[in-house]
Design a protein with these regions (language model features):
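Short beta-strand elements that form the blades of beta-propeller/WD-repeat-like
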Residues: 27-36, 81-92, 138-152, 157-158, ...
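Structural motif
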Residues: 39-45, 92-103, 154-161, 203-212, ...
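Post-signal peptide N-terminal segment of secreted/secretory-pathway proteins
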Residues: 42-151, 155-156
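A short beta-strand motif characteristic of beta-propeller blades
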Residues: 53-67, 115-132, 166-179, 219-227, ...
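Repeated scaffold domains used in trafficking and secretory/extracellular systems
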Residues: 67-80, 124-143, 178-192, 227-239, ...
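Long, acidic/polar, low-complexity amphipathic helices and coiled-coil-like
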Residues: 112-245
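Acidic, serine/threonine- and glycine-rich low-complexity intrinsically disordered segments
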Residues: 190-337
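Loop/turn-rich, solvent-exposed surfaces of beta-rich toroidal or solenoidal domains
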Residues: 330-411
């Protein structure tokens, strides 16, 4: 089925059914989204004219046919007009895992001290590496100009970038593998010089372990540090500090950019998030960053909270905003960006596996007074969105900020739709139906 447009004009606030009319207009953004059930990547140019928005769904030329029973797309990242998406299978990588690199067809046009994206070509697959030797990645990050892929079954990770992918004689030569981390790996990379790679172990000698790995020409595994609790899942770098997500709270260390410290000389700092009603320590599973802040969610239902850490502080602590959700709802990892005027905003989906028709989106103004302190963060009234379709780690909503931060685009997996929502008045400005179950979303735009 091709996408059908639901156009909301500026003169009307209600959505009046569907339309197959696609207004000719300027391209606001080029969108890429994953269809979870089909294991395909789709794309469309989001266009805007005086009549409203239009979107026409397309397949990507050369995208591999995956086994929908045993292979899935995982995280994806974009840089310099190149998009990389990870591939994972259900047999520890034996069926075929790895990555696919897509030329987005987008180019940067210089305008004095800034640039604009132009879209002269349709997207196409540049290269791919899917075989039994890629370690079954679950996580693919972007730090600076680097794509960093966790090779879980190989106890290591691969670093590549847009230039290395484009210049490589073969896909196997596009990246460099490093040993570090184990089981189900999460990663932080500091200034392109050092990686912190986690171990997932709950107990034993590798519980709480983080390998510190020098990157570049003189690469080597430097040493490892240990957090006080295990089940590490989550890591990030912000403002000269590296943060980790163990089973209890948050841990952080000063980034060792030269990898000249030793395990004994590194202080692993611990921050508490709080406890649940049974007295168990709260944790998180992933971080996002914006400017000097690390942002994450913790807790469930009425105990849900959006948390922030000011990484620029010498002695950072956890601040939080209570987000009292329904008993069957939980918060997805926040999506962070800049709204109108450059103010930081967090998009927080409250999702219910039992009743996805009740899913909501909270827009949180992180710094209403603009002083750089998030202690005055405030959530707006929730927006009713389409349903999720949660299956394990998949089937969640996603969102991207559109140019100038005045609108966002969101995916609704449960009813196969993509919406455009205003951040000014929180109205739904357009709805588009699409094939399959749209989940993860990436935007190429100004």
């Amino acid at each position: 089925m091709t996408i059908r447009s639901f156009i909301l004009t500026f003169a009307a606030l209600s959505l009046m059914g569907s339309s197959s009319v696609h207004a000719e207009g300027r391209t606001v953004a080029r969108l890429f989204w994953q269809g979870h059930q089909s294991a395909k990547l789709k794309w469309a140019d989001l266009q805007k004219s005086k009549d409203g928005y239009a979107l026409s769904e397309n397949d990507i030329s050369g995208f591999p046919e995956l086994d929908t029973d045993d292979q899935t797309l995982v995280q994806m990242q974009a840089d310099d007009g190149l998009l990389v998406v990870g591939v994972r299978d259900e047999a520890n990588g034996d069926i075929g895992s790895g990555w696919v690199a897509i030329e987005t067809g987008a180019t940067q046009e210089a305008h004095g001290d800034h640039f604009h994206w132009r879209f002269p070509e349709p997207p196409s697959v540049h290269s791919k590496l899917i075989d039994s030797g890629q370690g079954n990645p679950a996580h693919l990050y972007r730090y600076g100009k680097s794509f960093v892929m966790a090779n879980d079954q190989r106890n290591g990770f691969t670093v590549l970038n847009s230039k290395s992918v484009r210049d490589a004689d073969s896909p196997a030569e596009a990246g460099r593998f490093y040993e570090g981390g184990g089981g189900h790996i999460t990663l932080a990379v500091a200034e392109g010089k050092v990686a912190y790679s986690t171990w997932i172990d709950r107990e034993g000698e590798n519980a709480g372990r983080v390998d510190v790995v020098r990157l570049g020409e003189n690469a080597e595994k430097g040493y490892h540090i240990t957090c006080p609790t295990g089940v590490l899942h989550g890591a990030t770098y912000c403002d000269d500090k590296v943060f980790f997500a163990p089973s209890d709270g948050v841990c952080w260390v000063h980034a060792d950019l030269e990898v000249d410290d030793t395990a004994d000389s590194v202080t692993v700092n611990h921050l508490e998030i709080g406890t649940d009603p049974e007295g168990n320590p709260l944790r998180t599973g992933a971080f996002t960053t914006i400017d000097h802040a690390v942002v994450f969610t913790s807790g469930k239902a009425e105990q849900s909270k959006l948390c922030f850490i000011d990484a620029s502080c010498d002695t950072p602590d956890v601040q939080s905003l209570s987000m009292k959700l329904a008993s069957d709802q939980s918060l997805k990892t926040p999506i962070i960006g800049k709204g109108s005027g450059g103010r930081p905003i967090a998009l927080c989906f409250a999702e219910s596996k039992e009743a996805p028709e009740t899913d909501q989106l909270y827009v949180v103004d992180l710094d209403p007074d603009g002083n750089g302190d998030y202690s005055d963060a405030k959530a707006r009234e929730p927006i009713a969105v389409g349903p999720s379709q949660i299956e394990g780690h998949f089937g969640h909503h996603d969102a991207v900020f559109l140019p100038r931060g005045r609108q966002i685009a969101v995916t609704n997996p449960g009813d196969a739709s993509i919406w455009v929502i205003s951040l000014t008045d929180q109205s739904v400005q357009a709805k588009f139906e699409c094939e399959g179950t749209p989940t993860s979303l990436v935007s190429i735009s100004d």
